[in-house]
Amino acid sequence: MKIKVVVHPNSKKKRMDKDLLGILHVYVSEPPLKGRANMAVIESLTKYFKTKRRNVILLSGSKSKNKAFEILGSY
C-alpha cells in the first residue's frame, strides 16, 4: 500500500492525523537533521500499521516534508 505523508518536525507532541484527502500528517519531536525526523516517522508508521521496520519503505521526499511511503505485508 502506498501512502502520502506530511511530516511536521520539532513538534511538542508526537501524534498522527489523517485529513479529508487521505493524507497522513505525522508530528514528530525530532529535528530534520541527519535523517532523524525520517527515522522517527518510520518508527511511528511501524507502530500505526503494526508491522516491522523493514516493511516501511520511503519512496520519495527524503529531504522534503511531503513524503511517499510504501507499506509491505499485512496490516
Regions of interest found by a model, annotated:
Residues 42-75:
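C-terminal structural segments of small proteins and small subunits
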Residues 4-8, 57-58:
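Short, Lys/Arg-enriched charge-dense amphipathic segments
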Residues 6, 11, 21-22, 26-35, ...:
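Compact, glycine-rich, soluble single-domain proteins
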Residues 1-3, 20-24, 52-54, 65-67:
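A generic structural signal for short beta-strands and their flanking turns/coil linkers
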Residues 16-17:
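A structural signal for short hydrophobic beta-strand segments in well-ordered beta-sheet cores
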Residues 1, 12-13:
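Residue-level marker for the onset of beta-strands and adjacent loop->beta junctions
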